[in-house]
Protein backbone atom coordinates (compact mmCIF):
# COMPACT_ATOMS: atom_id res chain seq x y z
CA UNK A 1 0.00 0.00 0.00
CA UNK A 2 1.27 3.45 -0.89
CA UNK A 3 0.06 6.89 0.05
CA UNK A 4 -0.35 9.62 -2.55
CA UNK A 5 -0.92 13.31 -1.86
CA UNK A 6 -2.52 15.56 -4.45
CA UNK A 7 -2.80 19.32 -4.84
CA UNK A 8 -5.25 21.51 -6.70
CA UNK A 9 -3.13 24.58 -7.51
CA UNK A 10 -4.68 27.98 -6.91
CA UNK A 11 -3.76 31.61 -6.49
CA UNK A 12 -5.51 32.09 -3.12
CA UNK A 13 -5.51 28.53 -1.79
CA UNK A 14 -4.44 25.03 -2.69
CA UNK A 15 -6.76 22.10 -2.33
CA UNK A 16 -5.15 19.00 -0.85
CA UNK A 17 -6.13 15.35 -0.72
CA UNK A 18 -4.59 12.08 0.37
CA UNK A 19 -5.15 8.84 -1.51
CA UNK A 20 -4.33 5.17 -1.02
CA UNK A 21 -3.19 2.81 -3.75
CA UNK A 22 -5.08 -0.17 -2.29
CA UNK A 23 -8.51 1.45 -2.09
CA UNK A 24 -7.91 3.70 -5.13
CA UNK A 25 -9.76 6.43 -3.24
CA UNK A 26 -8.84 9.80 -1.79
CA UNK A 27 -10.05 12.03 1.02
CA UNK A 28 -9.95 15.82 1.21
CA UNK A 29 -7.52 17.53 3.54
CA UNK A 30 -7.49 21.06 4.90
CA UNK A 31 -6.98 23.68 2.20
CA UNK A 32 -3.64 25.48 2.23
CA UNK A 33 -3.67 29.28 2.04
CA UNK A 34 -1.64 30.85 -0.76
CA UNK A 35 -0.80 34.33 -1.90
CA UNK A 36 -0.58 34.81 -5.66
CA UNK A 37 0.04 31.09 -6.13
CA UNK A 38 2.70 30.80 -3.43
CA UNK A 39 1.58 28.41 -0.70
CA UNK A 40 2.35 28.56 2.97
CA UNK A 41 5.28 26.19 2.70
CA UNK A 42 5.16 25.33 6.41
CA UNK A 43 1.63 23.96 5.87
CA UNK A 44 2.82 21.94 2.85
CA UNK A 45 5.73 20.60 4.87
CA UNK A 46 3.49 19.61 7.79
CA UNK A 47 1.11 17.80 5.43
CA UNK A 48 3.94 15.91 3.71
CA UNK A 49 5.50 15.01 7.05
CA UNK A 50 2.18 13.68 8.35
CA UNK A 51 1.29 11.58 5.30
CA UNK A 52 4.77 10.64 3.97
CA UNK A 53 3.58 10.11 0.39
CA UNK A 54 5.32 7.84 -2.10
CA UNK A 55 4.20 10.27 -4.80
CA UNK A 56 2.74 13.77 -5.09
CA UNK A 57 0.27 14.64 -7.83
CA UNK A 58 -0.22 18.26 -8.86
CA UNK A 59 -3.24 19.23 -10.91
CA UNK A 60 -2.34 20.89 -14.19
CA UNK A 61 -5.01 23.41 -15.27
CA UNK A 62 -4.75 23.06 -19.04
CA UNK A 63 -6.99 25.02 -21.38
CA UNK A 64 -10.05 23.17 -22.63
CA UNK A 65 -8.31 22.54 -25.98
CA UNK A 66 -5.39 20.90 -24.14
CA UNK A 67 -2.99 23.78 -24.63
CA UNK A 68 -0.86 25.00 -21.75
CA UNK A 69 -2.33 27.88 -19.77
CA UNK A 70 -0.51 30.45 -17.65
CA UNK A 71 -1.92 28.69 -14.58
CA UNK A 72 -0.55 25.37 -15.85
CA UNK A 73 2.92 26.92 -16.09
CA UNK A 74 2.59 28.15 -12.51
CA UNK A 75 1.39 24.72 -11.34
CA UNK A 76 4.42 23.14 -13.02
CA UNK A 77 6.67 25.61 -11.19
CA UNK A 78 5.03 24.60 -7.91
CA UNK A 79 5.64 20.92 -8.79
CA UNK A 80 9.33 21.61 -9.48
CA UNK A 81 9.61 23.40 -6.15
CA UNK A 82 7.97 20.48 -4.34
CA UNK A 83 10.47 18.13 -5.92
CA UNK A 84 13.41 20.42 -5.16
CA UNK A 85 12.48 21.19 -1.56
CA UNK A 86 11.39 17.73 -0.44
CA UNK A 87 13.04 15.37 -2.96
CA UNK A 88 9.68 13.75 -3.74
CA UNK A 89 8.46 12.19 -6.95
CA UNK A 90 5.92 14.53 -8.51
CA UNK A 91 3.49 13.83 -11.34
CA UNK A 92 1.32 16.34 -13.16
CA UNK A 93 -2.31 15.40 -13.82
CA UNK A 94 -4.83 17.04 -16.11
CA UNK A 95 -7.29 18.79 -13.85
CA UNK A 96 -9.66 20.25 -16.40
CA UNK A 97 -13.16 20.57 -14.97
CA UNK A 98 -12.29 19.21 -11.50
CA UNK A 99 -13.25 22.49 -9.79
CA UNK A 100 -16.52 22.61 -11.74
CA UNK A 101 -17.17 18.98 -10.82
CA UNK A 102 -16.49 19.75 -7.14
CA UNK A 103 -18.84 22.74 -7.18
CA UNK A 104 -21.55 20.66 -8.87
CA UNK A 105 -21.20 18.00 -6.21
CA UNK A 106 -21.58 20.58 -3.41
CA UNK A 107 -24.66 22.10 -5.10
CA UNK A 108 -26.27 18.69 -5.63
CA UNK A 109 -25.44 17.26 -2.23
CA UNK A 110 -25.97 20.32 -0.04
CA UNK A 111 -27.95 22.75 -2.19
CA UNK A 112 -25.31 25.35 -1.39
CA UNK A 113 -23.38 27.87 -3.38
CA UNK A 114 -21.20 28.93 -0.45
CA UNK A 115 -18.29 26.91 -1.76
CA UNK A 116 -15.81 28.24 0.81
CA UNK A 117 -17.64 26.33 3.54
CA UNK A 118 -17.15 23.04 1.73
CA UNK A 119 -13.43 23.10 0.83
CA UNK A 120 -14.20 22.85 -2.89
CA UNK A 121 -10.52 23.06 -3.79
CA UNK A 122 -9.76 20.01 -1.66
CA UNK A 123 -12.71 18.17 -3.20
CA UNK A 124 -11.17 19.00 -6.59
CA UNK A 125 -7.87 17.57 -5.29
CA UNK A 126 -9.75 14.34 -4.45
CA UNK A 127 -10.92 14.13 -8.07
CA UNK A 128 -7.34 14.78 -9.27
CA UNK A 129 -5.90 11.99 -7.10
CA UNK A 130 -8.64 9.46 -7.86
CA UNK A 131 -8.46 10.17 -11.61
CA UNK A 132 -4.69 9.72 -11.57
CA UNK A 133 -4.94 6.46 -9.60
CA UNK A 134 -7.60 5.14 -11.98
CA UNK A 135 -5.61 6.15 -15.08
CA UNK A 136 -2.52 4.34 -13.77
CA UNK A 137 -4.26 1.31 -12.21
CA UNK A 138 -2.59 -1.18 -14.58
CA UNK A 139 0.95 -0.11 -13.69
CA UNK A 140 0.45 1.58 -10.32
CA UNK A 141 3.15 -0.42 -8.56
CA UNK A 142 5.74 0.66 -11.14
CA UNK A 143 4.82 4.32 -10.61
CA UNK A 144 4.76 4.15 -6.83
CA UNK A 145 7.77 1.88 -6.33
CA UNK A 146 10.14 2.31 -9.30
CA UNK A 147 13.49 0.54 -9.23
CA UNK A 148 16.24 2.98 -8.27
CA UNK A 149 19.05 3.46 -10.73
CA UNK A 150 22.40 3.73 -9.04
CA UNK A 151 23.54 7.35 -8.98
CA UNK A 152 20.46 8.59 -10.85
CA UNK A 153 17.13 9.97 -9.78
CA UNK A 154 13.93 8.40 -11.06
CA UNK A 155 11.90 11.36 -9.88
CA UNK A 156 9.46 12.36 -12.60
CA UNK A 157 7.98 15.71 -13.35
CA UNK A 158 5.85 15.75 -16.49
Curated annotation (Swiss-Prot):
Family listed: Belongs to the YqgF nuclease family.
Which top EC class is given?
hydrolase
| UniProt keyword annotation of rRNA processing present | no
Cell location:
Cytoplasm
Whose protein is this, by species?
A: Hahella chejuensis (strain KCTC 2396)
One GO term (biological process): rRNA 5'-end processing
Q: Name one Pfam family in it.
A: RuvX
Q: What is this protein called?
A: Putative pre-16S rRNA nuclease
